[in-house]
Amino acid sequence: MFYNLAIILYDIAVHLVAPFSRKPRKMMKGHWVVYELLRQQLEKDARYIWFHAASLGEFEQGRPLIEKIRAKYPDYRILLTFFSPSGYEVRKNYRGADIVCYLPFDKPRNVRKFLDLVNPCMAFFIKYEFWKNYLDELHKRRIPVYSVSSIFRRGQIFFKWYGGTYRNVLRNFDHIFVQNERSKRYLAKIGINRVTVVGDTRFDRVLQIREEAKDLPLVELFKNNTMTFVAGSSWQPDEDLFIEYFNQHPEVKLIIAPHVIDENHLVEIIRKLKRPYVRYTRADEKNVRKADCLIIDCFGLLSSIYRYGAVSYTHLRAHETGAYL
């Protein structure tokens, strides 16, 4: 089947590039130990509720639900899995979960091994997570599974004439909680009616983040009452645009928090800058005052940094298929 072949090829590709790239290398290290980690940390006879998020953004979207369930059902244990290192590396010590680990690649053998170990009493997949083999196996084992804060668009493969396989993937969900009425209508057209519109959980999380935001004295010194533009989770095409603007407007300061914190990418950002800059991990009270651009080269600060910007930008990656293939 094409899907399983694509997963195998992706797995091979990650292994091939891991020696040369930091992010795939971290992912593979996490995958190598995931089953042993589960054997060591799973509590015998405990009941686990499993949450899966692709990355940090999806985790933040599902976090209000995780914490409400944690508070309401304290006898249950929480398992949190990530696909991306940018989620796992930041939240591997998240206190709202009992176990945090990577999700093994969606190959049938991995799926059976993972579910045999965890045996969750229910599962929540956040937003765009539609892993076929996991969902098929959960349905086969009669484990309730829910899609949370999902959003659907007309161009996704589920709504194409050739998308029957992927429509069946959606039918594995016991219920789908979507962000808007349009998503509900699209699903109804393909016969999926176990759907509820609940809005965007990011708004709940934004209010929570506002209460939890940390003071960052170095960022305050950098800003120094100057018009500051914050670019969060940026990618190279975004950076080309706002760095060009920044270079031509000396009255504006810039804070860049790139999605990929890789040394090669950071060097590429620096190469484009024509004004003084400093990296956050190398900043002090003296050099941060002289900089016009602050590069955030570490994880975990972005939610606290946005409030320092007069204008903020966050890149939202478009998922044309709505699935990881």
Show where each model-derived region lies.
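Short, surface-exposed amphipathic charged segments that create phosphate/polyanion-binding patches used
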Residues: 115-118, 210-215, 269-271, 289-297
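Conserved catalytic-core segment of nucleotide-activated headgroup transferases in glycan assembly
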Residues: 58-69, 215-283
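Donor nucleotide-activated moiety binding/catalytic core segment of transferases
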Residues: 202, 281-312
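Membrane-interacting alpha-helical segments
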Residues: 2, 6, 10-17
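Conserved small/polar residues in nucleotide/adenosyl-binding loops
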Residues: 314-321
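Active-site and donor-binding regions of nucleotide-sugar-utilizing enzymes
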Residues: 15, 19-212, 235-236, 259-261, ...
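Glycine-rich phosphate-binding loop signature in dinucleotide/nucleotide-binding domains
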Residues: 117-119, 223-224, 308
